[in-house]
C-alpha cells in the first residue's frame, strides 16, 4: 500500500506533510488529536497562521450567501486566510469571497485530495490551489463518506483562530465544527438570522450560548486583534455603491412598490408577500 500511495502522490503532484515536517501547520500541533499527516495541493505558508473558518449550511438563503462572500472578502482583503470545506452553499461562498479579494483560502476535504466533491466545484478547486491550498488527511482516492466529515471538521477548527458559522440548522454539521473550536480554545462567531427560518436556528442558538454576534468582518478583526495589514480592519473595503441604473429604478417606485421590493431578499410565496403588504 505504501509504495502504491507514494506513486500516486508523485503522479498527482501532491505534497505529503508529516507532523515533524517544518511546513506542517503549527496550529494543528496544539490540538489534542492532530492528523498524523496531510496531503496538500497548493501551498501552506506563515500567513495562514492568521486564519478564520467560515462554515454553514449547504442550502443557504441569498442572505447567507451574500454574508459569507462579503465577510470572507473583507477578511481576506485584510490578510486573513479563509478556511472552509469546499461544500456547496456557505463553504463555496466563503472560498469565492476570499478569491474575489485576491486573498488566501484553504479547503479541507472529507475525501481524498484528488476527489472533488461536489464535482461541480472543479473550477473552484483549481482556483483554491492557485490561491492557497486544498488539504486532506485521507488517502488518495478516498470517497466522500458521511463519517469522514466530522473527522475533517476538527482540522478546520484546528487550523484557525476562530470559526464563523453562517446559517445553520440545529442539527448542522457546522455546529460540530463550532463545538470543536471551543474545545480547542478557539473563538466562535455567528451571524444572526431570521428567527422564523430553521436555517438560522443553529446560529441564533450559538449566540444565545455565548458565541460572538457578527455583522461584518470588523467584528471579527477587532475581537481577535488580527490583521495582515497590522491594523485591525485596515484592509476593509467599503460596500460597493448602488449602480446609477438601480438608483433610477428605486427613485421611481411608489411606497407600496418599495415595501414589496424589501420583502424579496429571499424566495417567497405570493400569498406571503400579499399578507405582509
Identify the meaning behind each predicted range:
Residues 1-5:
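Helix-hairpin-helix
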Amino acid at each position: 500500500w505504501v509504495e502504491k500511495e507514494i506513486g500516486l502522490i508523485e503522479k498527482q503532484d501532491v505534497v505529503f506533510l508529516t507532523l515533524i515536517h517544518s511546513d506542517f501547520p503549527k496550529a494543528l500541533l496544539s490540538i489534542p488529536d492532530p492528523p498524523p499527516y496531510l496531503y496538500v495541493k497548493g501551498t501552506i505558508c506563515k500567513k495562514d497562521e492568521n486564519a478564520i473558518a467560515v462554515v454553514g449550511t449547504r442550502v443557504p438563503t441569498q442572505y447567507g450567501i451574500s454574508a459569507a462572500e462579503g465577510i470572507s472578502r473583507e477578511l481576506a482583503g485584510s490578510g486573513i486566510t479563509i478556511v472552509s470545506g469546499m461544500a456547496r452553499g456557505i463553504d463555496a461562498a466563503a472560498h469565492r469571497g476570499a478569491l474575489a479579494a485576491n486573498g488566501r483560502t484553504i479547503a479541507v476535504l472529507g475525501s481524498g485530495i484528488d476527489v472533488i466533491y461536489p464535482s461541480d466545484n472543479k473550477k473552484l478547486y483549481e482556483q483554491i490551489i492557485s490561491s492557497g491550498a486544498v488539504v486532506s488527511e485521507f488517502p488518495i482516492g478516498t470517497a466522500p463518506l458521511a463519517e469522514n466529515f466530522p473527522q475533517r471538521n476538527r482540522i478546520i477548527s484546528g487550523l484557525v483562530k476562530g470559526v464563523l458559522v453562517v446559517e445553520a440548522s440545529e442539527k448542522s454539521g457546522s455546529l460540530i465544527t463550532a463545538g470543536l473550536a471551543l474545545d480547542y480554545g478557539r473563538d466562535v462567531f455567528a451571524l444572526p438570522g431570521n428567527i422564523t427560518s430553521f436555517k438560522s436556528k443553529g446560529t441564533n442558538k450559538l449566540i444565545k450560548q455565548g458565541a460572538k454576534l457578527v455583522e461584518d468582518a470588523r467584528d471579527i478583526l477587532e475581537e481577535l486583534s488580527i490583521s495582515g495589514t497590522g491594523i485591525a480592519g485596515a484592509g476593509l473595503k467599503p460596500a460597493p455603491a448602488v449602480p446609477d441604473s438601480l438608483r433610477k429604478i428605486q427613485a421611481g417606485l411608489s411606497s407600496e412598490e418599495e415595501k414589496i421590493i424589501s420583502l424579496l431578499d429571499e424566495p417567497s410565496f405570493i400569498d406571503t408577500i400579499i399578507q405582509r403588504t
